[in-house]
């Protein structure tokens, strides 16, 4: 089971500084969509140039022109790129092919997908490396949790890894870990903590059963 740090609300320099503080406890560091919107793909390159020992994920939430957009993210140092599960099959297929051609991985974000099990099965067959159940910021505010979605997706896939995103914190991660996802994504639970290093360590300890 891997741990990913999602960084959304910092600039690229602050993101790299935070990532380096916690890199001993995380496997993947995400340059979140807000950073990409504010600073572009050079933010991905900046992180890649300033950290060792972790994979860098570019959260582009691709919807169309997928092979081109994946190729650009890879060019700027991304190891993992995200596409939306509601994208057309042709877009998913193009993204998978482009990522794999370059030895990189594709994470499919299931935010706003209505029939989770049907789409997860299709994405599994299309070759997605990760299928991520995602309770977005707006639904988190309404008290929703990704755990039931995680169970639904896990029950129908054979090849893809399952990731879980949305409101996970050090004090709630154990209930997520109990569902045995392959990747747990924590954002503000680490980034906004008074002590991000301690928060990252607590998350990693939970994943490793300590």
From Swiss-Prot:
Keywords: Carbohydrate metabolism, Lyase, One-carbon metabolism. It catalyses: D-ribulose 5-phosphate + formaldehyde = D-arabino-hex-3-ulose 6-phosphate. One of its GO terms (biological process) is formaldehyde assimilation via ribulose monophosphate cycle. It comes from the Bacteria. Pathway: One-carbon metabolism; formaldehyde assimilation via RuMP pathway; D-fructose 6-phosphate from D-ribulose 5-phosphate and formaldehyde: step 1/2. GO terms for molecular function: 3-dehydro-L-gulonate-6-phosphate decarboxylase activity; hexulose-6-phosphate synthase activity; orotidine-5'-phosphate decarboxylase activity. It is an enzyme of class 4 (lyase). PANTHER family: 3-KETO-L-GULONATE-6-PHOSPHATE DECARBOXYLASE SGBH-RELATED. Catalyzes the condensation of ribulose 5-phosphate with formaldehyde to form 3-hexulose 6-phosphate. Belongs to the HPS/KGPDC family. HPS subfamily. This is 3-hexulose-6-phosphate synthase 3. It comes from Staphylococcus saprophyticus subsp. saprophyticus (strain ATCC 15305 / DSM 20229 / NCIMB 8711 / NCTC 7292 / S-41).
């Amino acid at each position: 089971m891997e741990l990913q740090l999602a960084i959304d609300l910092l600039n690229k320099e602050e993101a790299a500084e935070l990532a380096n503080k916690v890199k001993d406890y995380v496997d993947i560091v995400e340059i979140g969509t807000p950073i990409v919107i504010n600073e572009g793909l050079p933010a991905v390159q900046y992180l890649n140039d300033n950290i060792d020992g972790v994979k860098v994920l570019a959260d582009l939430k691709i919807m169309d022109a997928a092979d081109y957009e994946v190729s650009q993210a890879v060019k700027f140092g991304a190891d993992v790129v995200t596409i939306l599960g509601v994208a057309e099959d042709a877009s998913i297929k193009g993204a998978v092919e482009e990522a794999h051609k370059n030895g990189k991985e594709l994470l499919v974000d299931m935010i706003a997908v209505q029939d989770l099990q049907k789409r997860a099965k299709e994405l599994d067959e299309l070759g997605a490396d990760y299928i991520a159940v995602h309770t977005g910021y707006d639904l988190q505010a309404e008290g929703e949790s990704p755990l039931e979605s995680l169970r639904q997706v896990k029950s129908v896939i054979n090849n893809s890894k399952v990731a879980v995103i949305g409101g996970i914190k050090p004090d709630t991660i154990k209930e997520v870990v109990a569902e045995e996802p392959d990747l747990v994504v924590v954002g503000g639970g680490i980034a906004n903590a008074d002590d991000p290093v301690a928060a990252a360590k607590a998350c990693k300890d939970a994943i490793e059963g300590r």
